[in-house]
């Protein structure tokens, strides 16, 4: 299984699409990409995690660190997770919910919703 992070820009937002397993081995890759994006001057970041099918505590740690970094720049971080809810939604959503940190993040059902200003985040 290949872990991949691809990036692009849409207006003021940097978008990182993540796929594969987000774990102890792969989480440093995502951490570095987030740091690179912020170092390039992007303070609005969408992390598309809809293709991440496994996430362990180190992956959650990277998400929390990304939130802290973006907030320190007065930026905005939005996560994209499939909109099926915490109960039967993505593995990442279930892990965030189980660890009690889901409420820390603005979560959207797809990238277009995350990029829009009128869409409300999905409820935790």
Short names for language-model regions:
Residues 1-53, 65-124:
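STAS-like cytosolic regulatory interaction modules
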């Amino acid at each position: 299984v290949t872990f991949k992070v691809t990036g692009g820009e849409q207006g003021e937002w940097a978008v990182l699409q993540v796929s594969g397993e987000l774990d102890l081995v792969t989480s440093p890759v995502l951490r570095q990409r987030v740091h690179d994006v912020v170092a390039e001057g992007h303070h609005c970041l969408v992390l598309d995690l809809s293709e991440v099918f496994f996430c362990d505590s180190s992956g959650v740690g990277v998400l929390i660190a990304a939130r802290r970094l973006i907030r320190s720049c007065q930026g905005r971080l939005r996560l994209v997770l499939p909109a099926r809810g915490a109960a039967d939604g993505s593995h990442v959503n279930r892990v965030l919910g189980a660890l009690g940190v889901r409420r820390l993040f603005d979560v959207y059902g797809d990238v277009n919703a995350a990029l829009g200003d009128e869409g409300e985040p999905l409820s935790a």
